[in-house]
Amino acid sequence: MPAQLFSFGGILFVIIALAIGSYFFSSRRVISQAQASGIKPHSLGMYYGLYAAIWAFVPAALLLIAFTGTTKPLLDGLIEQSLIQAAPELPQSFIPLKIAQIKNIANGFIEPTDETMAMLGQEYKAMRDNMGNLRFAAVLMVGLLGLGFATWRISPQFKSRIVFETFLRRAFF
């Protein structure tokens, strides 16, 4: 998969697309359920779609924000531990400088000065890529679980307008 898909903007685009898809899927689903059962839906079709879109988007977006806020400090701590293990004689004041060099090596901005820095640069790049894959998978899974939960709850008798308006009141007031 392209690296842009695992960026914050790429993942945000994916969960927005998931929310839009869940809107249309749920709106049509409740209308077909109502026609099949002969029961008039409690709310308009758009409210069922909005309910599903909220469940697909909000938990996934919150997880994306949490992941984004914790990834950099976690990766920095892991690479610092690897650096200290690889070069225990390194003075404490040089550690931030070496971490910056490792990041630049991983990004391809500079060439490694020795074998240890090359290994640490590759390790940092691998950890960063794995964290991006994990973030993408976790956010997508939460979005799909939200869609599944909303789909499970939606029926013509479900009062989606009331639930949607309650969500808006709690979120903004």
Positions of the model-derived regions?
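Membrane-topology segments of multi-pass transport proteins
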Residues: 2-172
